[in-house]
Every structure is written in structure tokens, then in C-alpha cells.
Amino acid sequence: MSVSEANGTETIKPPMNGNPYGPNPSDFLSRVNNFSIIESTLREGEQFANAFFDTEKKIQIAKALDNFGVDYIELTSPVASEQSRQDCEAICKLGLKCKILTHIRCHMDDARVAVETGVDGVDVVIGTSQYLRKYSHGKDMTYIIDSATEVINFVKSKGIEVRFSSEDSFRSDLVDLLSLYKAVDKIGVNRVGIADTVGCATPRQVYDLIRTLRGVVSCDIECHFHNDTGMAIANAYCALEAGATHIDTSILGIGERNGITPLGALLARMYVTDREYITHKYKLNQLRELENLVADAVEVQIPFNNYITGMCAFTHKAGIHAKAILANPSTYEILKPEDFGMSRYVHVGSRLTGWNAIKSRAEQLNLHLTDAQAKELTVRIKKLADVRTLAMDDVDRVLREYHADLSDADRITKEASA
């Protein structure tokens, strides 16, 4: 900042690269402005406790996601049930622009069914941590590598994409993981996957593992982060910084337990990093409609503090905040609400309300107030707000009554002097 000698105000100088939160041009491995979203509402999201999507609803969600601009849609394994298989086939026949994937166990029986559904790719997974090797499938690393090799070669022979992922990656032995990924990369998988299945990883652990893996494999790297400890968004961002190429999301973050990286949250974070990339790639003004669609389907309310679309996401209440926002929204907003089809709201009915907000609201109602009058009226509104919550209609009524009193007083004064 520099200080103007004329009036003592500070002039804000833009950062040299235009965005202090943008990608580091010297970091050639970072993919924060060049990544793909694998949208898993119709796979991971089906594992949400309240979820039940019939065929019609799945098709509706798939079309909406495709129109929104996601790169991939991941579907529940066709082996899960007969209806799951039929739904997978139905969505594959829609002719969507995005690629359709299905998620299967590292079994040849699953692979044979999956490749016949018409999907563009198969996501193969098997547990690699000591917990899952002992209590889930009971197999050793030799068996895992052999099974992975067989399944991957089979899927590749059908001419479709294949991703191989470990499950519970961050509680797996690092040497085992790297040996496994090196083996499947040599076979020719399109992607390897890292999964924080229990949500235990920290951003630093994510960054370190992805950077290490990036030096071992030449294929793309997909990441799947659960949100048990509230780190799914930060972990997804750090994965991209470290060189990951694909991130799994679900609408509203729904999934097993308390879910995975929310689609809207990831886009909020990446928008700050590269607004142009995100606004050109995705139809952001459709995000609220997408979230409402899924929220209704699983019978939940969108949280008040939800990223971007929550009722309070662009609401400003404190007087000093409101004054600055009215002068320049960038003072207290890192996201532009209009880019997401949202609106800014300045709260004017509380004990925290400042006179700038009251004057701005009066102007919206075509009521002219001087600064002194706005300050006087603000004192009156604060007194009322100390007693009870004031709705916008309450504030508007007080504004109109005050302005009417001013008009009457002005008329009487003019008549007396005539």
C-alpha cells in the first residue's frame, strides 16, 4: 500500500502476479489450474445413510452434473445389485459429454460385469493397510499385485480406461504402496488412486505422499478424501499442489459416514486460486440448483454455512463490515456471489448495524436521508434490535415511517414560512 499525500488515504497496489493465491509459476508439478473432477455423488453419495436414488433420479443427477461441466461421473458397482447394473447401463446410453466410470473391487468377476455395461472406464480398488489386509480381505501384497495385474490387463484389453487405487492409503506401509503403484504403472493404468478412507490424513502428509508418488509413476494421480476430521477440502487442494491430476467429489460432500470433499467447496477453493479457469470450465450458476436437487433427494437441508450456497455465505452484519462491503465488496469477500448466481445481503436489523447500511437500504427504497438522519435512525433501530430480532420488513417500516415524519416536518416548516 502507498499513502496519498493529498488526503492521507491508502492506495491498494495489486500484487505483481495479479493473484497472491494463484499457482506458483515456478512449481511445474502443481495442477491447481489444470485438474479433473471425478464426481462421485452416484457412487460414494449412494453410501450416504439417507440416500436412495431411483433410476429416474440418477439420470436427472447425471444430466445435471454433465451440464455443469464435470469431467467424469462415477457410478456404483454394477455387481452391487441387479438394479445397480441396469442403472449403470441406462446412464451409459445417455450420450453425455463427460466420461462414465464404475467402481469395482479388484476381482475378475466384478471386472467382467463392469466392462459389459458400456462404461468409459473402470475404477479398481483394494485395501492395502494392515487393518484391511487382516480384517477385510485377508490377502498379502503379493496376492494384491497379482490380482491387480490380472484385472488391469483385462480391462485394458477392452479398450477402456482403468484406474487402480489402494484403499486406506495413509495407513498403509509406504514401501508397499510405492511398490504396488510402480507395478501397476508399468502395466499401463491411466491413473493410480490415493484414498484417505478414514479421513486421518493432514495436508502436509498428503503433499508429501503425492510428491513422492509423482516421482515414482508417470500416469495420472487421482485422490479421494474422506472428511471425518474436517480436512477433505484442504487435503484435496494440497494434493493438486503436489501434482495430483484428479479429485473425487460429491454434491454436498455426501458419502459414507460424513462424506468426502464437497463439489461446491472444492470449486470455492479453486476459484480463489484461478477464477478464470473455474468460471470458464464450470457453469457455476447451476451449483445451487444441483445442491437443491440432491438435498431434496436425500431429504436434508443445505447447511446455513454451506460453501457458496448457504444462506449466510454472502451475508454481512457487522457495521464496519457493511460499510466496507458497500464501498468495495472485495474488502470482505474473496468470492464474487454473482459468478455463482448468488446475491449479497447486508443485514440491517441488528444491534450491530451501522449507519452506512441503513442509508444504503434507504436508497434502495428511494428514500433520501442525510448522513446525520441515517445516524439518528440507526440509533432508533439499534434500540429496537436490543429487544427483539428485526426482519427486513420491520426495518423497512421504520425507515418509511421515519422518512414520512421528515416529509411532514418539512411540509409544516414550508407552510409556516409561506
From Swiss-Prot:
Its EC number is 2.3.3.14. The keyword Cytoplasm does not apply. It catalyses: acetyl-CoA + 2-oxoglutarate + H2O = (2R)-homocitrate + CoA + H(+). GO terms for biological process: lysine biosynthetic process; lysine biosynthetic process via aminoadipic acid. SUPFAM superfamilies: Aldolase (SSF51569). Residues 35-288 form the Pyruvate carboxyltransferase domain. This is Homocitrate synthase, mitochondrial. It comes from Schizosaccharomyces pombe (strain 972 / ATCC 24843) (Fission yeast). The lineage of its organism: Eukaryota, Fungi, Dikarya, Ascomycota, Taphrinomycotina.
